[in-house]
UniProtKB/Swiss-Prot annotation:
GO terms for biological process: tRNA methylation. It catalyses: uridine(54) in tRNA + S-adenosyl-L-methionine = 5-methyluridine(54) in tRNA + S-adenosyl-L-homocysteine + H(+); uridine(341) in tmRNA + S-adenosyl-L-methionine = 5-methyluridine(341) in tmRNA + S-adenosyl-L-homocysteine + H(+). This is tRNA/tmRNA (uracil-C(5))-methyltransferase. Its EC number is 2.1.1.-, 2.1.1.35. GO terms for cellular component: cytosol. It comes from Aromatoleum aromaticum (strain DSM 19018 / LMG 30748 / EbN1). PANTHER family: TRNA/TMRNA (URACIL-C(5))-METHYLTRANSFERASE, TRNA_TMRNA (URACIL-C(5))-METHYLTRANSFERASE. Belongs to the class I-like SAM-binding methyltransferase superfamily. RNA M5U methyltransferase family. TrmA subfamily. InterPro entries: MeTrfase_TrmA_AS, MeTrfase_TrmA_CS, SAM-dependent_MTases_sf, TrmA_MeTrfase, U5_MeTrfase_fam. NCBIfam families: trmA_only. The active site is at C320, E354.
């Protein structure tokens, strides 16, 4: 994680610059005025990781400037981190400094917090962990009231559980999400909640069935599923699929079929060019897809997935990379136009911008 330059007084102007760049980039596609969802200027980041810098008996959190990658910068406080992380950082450092067992060859510390106040800390070592470490770690976890995990090469010690439970309300509806250590979770919880709300508004009243690619732990699936008759969701990560199944059950979602497949594979399955054992319990003939939802990696949609998308009347696209989003929109321009747009400032004080587009078929929906 790079060291950001943080000045809350500059936040609004920095966001305005990013929005201007977004609008300029998508002007050739007649993008409507985007809805802008800002971040809180401080305490917005639910994930943080630090190298641990040892100097004699002293140990400190450290980050590195890309311009001087070998020179550590000691971190006394980290105001962009969520408040549970900020509160735990000095207490954890004190306990590490006081315990040779806990600090010896400690290489890195990772924090994962939730909007609902839970916190998980992973301590990563360059040595095997033994019973004495586990005893000291249990005392530390109890004192800090956190989930604590120890890692070293080919070793993982989970003292209680390796996940936290996120809880928040969306349009008055209480939601909960299991977030597993080491798997992808949204870094900016406040902005994520705004993304979910915007996505729901784009498809409210549409009905029909939804195909979702890259569903992760079900972040959007849980929010969107009640707005559709049926949902077919795909994801390749085993841990994310496990979390998604938990999250669907925990939120009483019963209209989602989930399969562990890549976008290439589901494209082939829908085109009936390949059969997959993983699809044996899914009757594709029952689905009447009205909408495709995608939240792909930075590389965007590959050519087969773009071809798949052309067959949908509505494409709801969340992107963490406006450049590949531009490329995909250009590839779809002959069949789809932009009907709605939003920008989500997941990463304040950086050049990165999350964005969302609603693409609809030119000339209206196809006849059923």
């Amino acid at each position: 994680m790079p060291l950001p330059a943080i000045d809350p007084a500059e936040y609004a102007s920095q966001l305005a610059d990013k929005v201007t760049q977004f609008k300029h980039a998508f002007t050739p596609f007649a993008v409507p005025e985007p809805t802008v969802f800002p971040s809180a200027p401080l305490h917005y980041r639910l994930r943080a990781e630090f190298r641990m810098w040892h100097d004699g008996e002293r140990i400190d959190y450290a980050m590195f400037d890309p311009a001087e990658p070998k020179q550590p910068i000691a971190i006394e406080q980290f105001d962009i981190a969520a408040e549970p992380i900020c509160a735990a950082m000095p207490r954890l450092r004190e306990r590490l400094r006081a315990s040779e067992t806990l600090k010896r060859r400690l290489f890195q510390v990772e924090f994962l917090a939730t909007l609902s106040g839970e916190l998980m800390i992973s301590l990563i070592y360059h040595r095997p962990l033994d019973e004495s470490w586990e005893a000291a770690a249990r005392e530390l976890a109890a004192e800090l009231n956190v989930q604590l995990i120890g890692r070293s090469r080919k070793q993982k010690i989970v003292l209680d559980r390796d996940w936290v439970l996120e809880r928040f309300a969306l349009d008055g509806r209480p939601l909960q999400y299991k977030q597993i250590e080491g798997s992808f979770t949204q870094p900016n919880g406040g902005v994520n909640r705004q993304m979910l709300g915007w996505a729901c508004e784009q498809v409210r009243g549409v009905g029909g069935d939804l195909l979702e690619l890259y569903c992760g732990n079900g972040n959007f699936t849980v929010a969107l599923a009640p707005l559709f008759d049926r949902v077919l969701a795909t994801e390749v990560s085993k841990t994310s699929v496990e979390a998604a199944h938990y999250n669907l059950a925990a939120n009483d979602i019963g209209n989602v079929a989930m399969v562990r497949m890549s976008s290439d594979e589901i494209s082939a399955a829908l085109a009936r060019t390949r059969e997959f054992r993983r699809m044996k319990d899914v009757d594709l003939d029952r689905y009447r897809f009205s909408t495709l939802f995608v939240d792909p990696p930075r590389s965007g949609l590959d050519a087969p997935t773009v071809e798949l998308a052309r067959g949908f009347d509505r494409i709801l696209y969340i992107s963490c990379n406006p450049q590949t989003l531009q490329e995909n929109v250009a590839a779809l321009q002959a069949t789809h136009g932009i009907a709605g747009a939003a920008v989500f400032d997941q990463f304040p004080y950086t050049r990165h911008l999350e964005c969302g587009l609603l693409l609809t078929r030119r000339g209206g929906p196809r006849a059923p």
